[in-house]
UniProtKB/Swiss-Prot annotation:
Top-level taxon: Bacteria
Organism, as annotated: Buchnera aphidicola subsp. Baizongia pistaciae (strain Bp)
Record-linked HAMAP family: Ribosomal_bS21
Record keywords: Ribonucleoprotein, Ribosomal protein
Biological process terms in GO annotation: translation
The protein's name: Small ribosomal subunit protein bS21
Pfam families in the cross-refs: Ribosomal_S21
Length: 71
């Protein structure tokens, strides 16, 4: 859990914004969303594999565009 210290004469809004930013950097909200509902291990593996394939195709298309632009 991210901890921030409220500085002297620091407005509450600024401290809250710093706390939210530190939570976002720590990945707490994404972890909560991921664990909100139970996901079967097979579904989790399938989702991870699909995202890996998507990353790979995206990378290959970017490389292909670089190659085309060189001409």
């Amino acid at each position: 859990m991210p901890i921030i210290k409220v500085r002297d004469n620091e407005p509450f809004d600024v401290a809250l914004r710093r706390f939210k930013r530190s939570c976002e950097k720590a990945g707490i909200l994404s972890e909560i969303r991921r664990r909100e509902f139970y996901e079967k291990p097979t579904t989790e593996r399938k989702r991870a594999k699909a995202s890996a394939i998507k990353r790979l195709t995206k990378k290959l298309s970017r490389e292909n565009l670089k190659r085309i632009r060189l001409y």
